[in-house]
Amino acid sequence: QKDAAAYKTPAAIKGKQVCAQLGTTGQLKAEEISGKKARTFNNAAEAMMELRNGGCDAVVADKPVIEYFLKESRQSRYFHELPTQLTTEDWGFAVKKGNKKVLNALNSALVSLQKDGTVAKIHKKWFNN
């Protein structure tokens, strides 16, 4: 928080030491923006704690993961979150080829959850500040 003014855009981490979760798109994006190899950790919470302890200048991770960490850990007073989204990603379920029964059940359930507002309620509960 004390140096929040120095980090208003992603470009501010150019040349800085950035932490990220190992093997994630956050790691790739951190290295792309900073121009340096990211310090990696098994999970985003470990990366956030390294930031708090001064071991890096920034953390790049999935927005919902960061928001959840800040909410649940009660550590938000130590961090400044940029409003900028660095990437977007699509997610899906893998279903064994030819298993139309499971595929159709998943697709049907997802559509139902979106239509009845369940997805929006879950998102609001877990990810809206």
Region spans (language model):
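Proline/Glycine/Serine-rich low-complexity intrinsically disordered segments
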Residues: 1-129
